[in-house]
Regions:
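Conserved nucleotide-sugar phosphate-binding/catalytic loop shared by glycosyltransferases and other
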Residues: 19-66
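Conserved nucleotide-sugar donor-interacting segment of glycosyltransferase catalytic cores
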Residues: 74-147, 200-201
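Donor-nucleotide binding loops and adjacent catalytic segments primarily
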Residues: 197-306
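Active-site-proximal region of nucleotide-activated glycan assembly enzymes
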Residues: 117-203, 209
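C-terminal amphipathic helix plus adjacent low-complexity
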Residues: 91, 358-412
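A donor-sugar binding/catalytic signature common to diverse glycosyltransferases
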Residues: 5-8, 96, 292-340
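Conserved nucleotide-sugar donor-binding subdomain of glycosyltransferases
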Residues: 53-105, 147, 151-185, 189
């Protein structure tokens, strides 16, 4: 939600009227950010559903985690197509700006006959033979063998995703929305897709369409709630910051392994455990370690020498924006694809979840800490992100794509 409310603030600053729509669990965050909220889906996704789903998802990995994600995507698609149009029609929405994961928005926009712009907050789901499937974790390989490998991977991915694809196709048929049976990129707007993924952190992809834009992340330094932290417990040693994100963070063994791997390295480990692991359930943690449920991530990254991450897009981009190299432990969904880009750009080292142990992780941490090239590469991408000014560029693209009058920021 943070990137979307950041983008919404920028559009409102430029004089445009903005409101949010979504399931009830989105409402407190949206209203807390100062925006109007119009909800739908309360029967199928009542308040509290997200926390229950995240609690289940927090302990899943690999194909099991991906399967659970596909199931919720199908449910969300059907609910969105059914319940969003009346809400948006009543609100007299002129255009939709929607997270790319919610492919139901494509069919909603078709029903309402309004333009759709999609935002790729995670790894973009644009499936072309030039790059590996986002969930594969495969290295970039531009030759013919690599493209054949990718094509096979997409066929397997399509088989795995067939419940979501079947639901989308059925709703499109019912609504009279034509689909190209040969195009695996169903549900993508041909107007604009804006990716937070910077081009400097992506694989080269000559197949991307002209309406795809790498803007880089949306940051304005606003909108995040204050998070208390025990700053007086910092020892002055170099900081290793570790977070497994907000979804797959229910693995106590991972946190214990991270603590063991980082002990005795002359650094202080700061771990954000998240909502599904407590200090009690994590058990005794080795070394010079500060473990908290929630941490002020941006502030700690600015002080960190290294970030240990699940390779979620938001944490990876925030680490890079701070010029901090990573050790990535991808678990499921698009995290292997993000981790593959960490390896490709040499902004860090990848330790796959299935091969994780303290010895292997310690080796990776030492490599990144001792080889200055990782930090230099991270700083290079940080400079590219700063120069790109992703938030302003995204707002420009929205205005240009929708042919909106360019507004001046409203002061006061």
């Amino acid at each position: 939600m943070n990137p979307m409310t950041t983008l919404a603030r920028k559009m409102r600053e430029r004089g445009h009227e903005v409101f949010f729509t979504g399931i009830p669990d989105c409402e407190p965050f949206v209203r807390g950010a100062g925006f109007e909220f119009r909800g739908f889906g309360a029967r199928q996704f009542p308040a509290g559903f997200s926390e229950e789903w995240l609690a289940r998802q927090s302990r899943l990995h690999g194909l099991e985690g991906l399967r659970a994600t596909v199931e919720i995507l199908v449910q969300g698609l059907e609910m969105t197509v059914r319940e969003a149009p009346p809400v948006l029609y009543e609100a007299r929405a002129d255009a939709l700006v929607w997270d790319e994961v919610g492919r139901g928005a494509f069919l909603v926009a078709a029903q309402l006959d309004v333009p759709l712009i999609q935002i790729a907050n995670a790894l973009p789901m644009h499936l072309y033979d030039s790059v590996p499937p986002p969930f594969s974790g495969w290295p970039y390989r531009p030759d013919a063998i690599g493209k054949i490998r990718n094509r096979i991977g997409y066929a397997a991915f399509g088989y795995f995703m067939r419940p979501a694809l079947a639901a989308f196709s059925e709703h499109a048929r019912r609504l009279g929305v034509p689909l190209d049976g040969k195009d695996r990129n169903h549900g993508l707007s041909k107007l604009a897709c804006i990716a937070q993924l910077p081009s400097a952190f992506d694989f080269p992809n000559p197949e991307l369409p002209s309406w795809f834009y790498h803007t880089g992340p949306f940051h304005d330094g606003l909108g995040r709630p204050h998070t208390d932290f025990v700053w007086d417990r910092l020892s002055g040693d170099p900081i290793i910051y570790a977070s497994m994100g907000t979804v797959q963070n229910g693995f106590e063994l991972v946190f214990r392994t991270i603590a063991e791997a980082c002990s005795g390295l002359g650094c202080q480990l700061v771990m954000s455990l998240g909502s599904h692991v407590t200090q009690e359930s994590a058990g005794p943690l080795a070394g010079n370690c500060v473990a908290v449920r929630y941490a002020p991530q941006l502030e700690l990254l600015r002080r960190a020498a290294l970030c240990i991450t699940h390779a979620g897009m938001n944490t990876a981009l925030e680490s890079l924006a701070a010029g901090v190299p990573m050790v990535a432990i991808p678990i499921t969904n698009d995290q292997p694809g993000v981790a593959a880009r960490v390896a490709y750009t040499r902004t860090g080292v990848v330790v796959p979840y299935r091969r994780l142990n303290a010895v292997r992780l310690r080796r990776a941490v030492r490599e990144v800490l001792n080889d200055s090239r990782y930090r230099e590469n991270a700083r290079r991408i940080a400079a590219a992100v700063q120069a790109a000014n992703g938030l302003e560029r995204a707002a420009d693209i929205i205005e240009e794509s929708l042919r909106l009058p360019r507004q001046r920021p409203q002061n006061g």
